[in-house]
Amino acid sequence: RSYCRVSRSKVMFYTVPIRNSARALKIDFIEDVIFNKPKITRFSGVPVYSIENIYWQKVAALAGTGSRQDEIGREVTKGRMEARDAFDIFVLSKKIRPLHIFLKKLPGDLQRGIVHWYRIFSRQDMKLSLLDLDIYDRGFNAREMIVYLENEVKEFIKQIL
């Protein structure tokens, strides 16, 4: 195991020997640096971010954290568009705090990023990507998740305008 610091991020490198293989498995963990002072709690003795910090990170992953110019010159953010992030936000929105309420506490660039995501994400690609996930809820319906998230973003837009 080795450790280094890149900017404010911490990076951990692990090398794990694999039985009957000449090559070792190399794993790296990169710490996201979104918070100056994240709220850390312990779960079975393991330090983890608070649920609110995790929610914030999931929104930042979907919305993006850096702005760029789009085709017509507008400043927009673009996140990683992963189905897993959308699913996690869906669960957090239903179990912790509705997304439209949580978004009000976030900086404007993340709010704009989620609205931009809502306007451009491919519903078809999202449904197909969700099929690849091992979702624990056997009654899960991708269409219902997408409609729920769309309605949360619409409600947020309605409340801030």
PLM regions: where:
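Compositionally biased terminal segments of proteins
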Residues: 1-161
